[in-house]
Amino acid sequence: PTIGAGRMLTNIGELKNLGFEAALYGSVLESKNMRWDLRGNFSINRNTVVSLMPGVDMLTHSNMDAGAALIVSVPGGSMGDIITYMPRINDAGQYIVDPESGYHQINFDEYDAEGNPVDYGYGDTRQKVGNAMPKVVGGFGSNLEVKDFFIDFVIDYSIGGDVVSLAGQYMKGAGMFEETLEYRDEENGGLAYYTDGDGTRHLADGASAGPAGERIYNDGLIIDGVKPDGTPNDIILSAGEYYMNTFQWGAVPAWGSGMSRYDDAVHKNTYVKFRELSIGYNLPQSMADKLKCNSIRVALTGSNLFYLYRTFKQFDPETNIGSSWVNQAIVSGSTSATRSIGFSVRASF
């Protein structure tokens, strides 16, 4: 018999965390007219997925672009592992190139001896390319008071952890990044080629036209790798085709080109950010007395000012939509970063 429920909440597994957190605060200098305080904290955490409930081999936290990339938890791994399909390689560690398309073959399911796909499906062939969890997080700050003036700042940092930039994936496929100028012309490394009457491309280095007067293009490239039989790849692609097909939406042919790869959309997310700066002044006590106040403090404050260092420069990952740790690991449809500057007056009575 049924109970009329469509879903239920249950403890689905066991997670082990091992970490350390510390905070320090102290005055480095103190005199009649000056006081300097420093503060800082950091935390380290390592987690391991010990087990999942019977019958569950993998817990999917986020399924991106029809399975092209996933954020998962797998027993023996860490919560937040990022997995995706990767190009196939042979026993010599060389990329295998599809003999028809000229693109890297993606490791979906099975291929025959000639390198032709037997089945395009969602087999368990995705590989770990990152993890969403930072290794170390923390910050430090300083407060310096000299007579009636003060300056206070906060710097925070995050070390390790990865983000999946879906927006960057699509923009790279559309040729919107400076790096996609590569191969677009001869100056940027593009190969010269022409296309014959059968649609086959041939290298034409130094030629002004093909044998039959064909037009010469200078946006060619040959992907590194070998064909399934071990011969070097010699298939010429145009730069536009390469970016569009390699970095488009989706992975398996039913949901994309079948040549897309998402490992390039995974970026290290280590940063040091100048979070806040306040500069202020305590008004003279005589002025506060006239206004019937015990004290009056005015300050100019700036928040989310700038990065001192960061490894991921496409977008500000802190502007991602959603506040959960999963949302913070996916850059997609985010708003622009904001820097705020304000003026405050604080009075005590």
Feature map (PLM): residue ranges:
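Extracytoplasmic loops and strand-loop junctions of Gram-negative outer membrane beta-barrel proteins
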Residues: 3-8, 23-25, 120-127, 257-265, ...
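Conserved small-residue
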Residues: 10-16, 20, 27-132, 163, ...
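Short sequence motifs at beta-strands and strand-loop junctions characteristic
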Residues: 12-18, 76, 130-135, 264-273, ...
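Hydrophobic, lipid-facing positions within transmembrane beta-strands of outer-membrane proteins
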Residues: 18-24, 38, 136-142, 149, ...
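Transmembrane beta-strands of outer-membrane beta-barrel pores
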Residues: 26-28, 42-48, 146-148, 157-161, ...
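Repeated loop/turn-to-beta-strand initiation elements of outer-membrane beta-barrel proteins
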Residues: 32, 148-153, 286-287
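Transmembrane beta-barrel strands of outer-membrane/channel proteins
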Residues: 38-44, 144, 153-157, 181, ...
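Membrane-interface anchoring segments and C-terminal beta-barrel signals
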Residues: 214-349
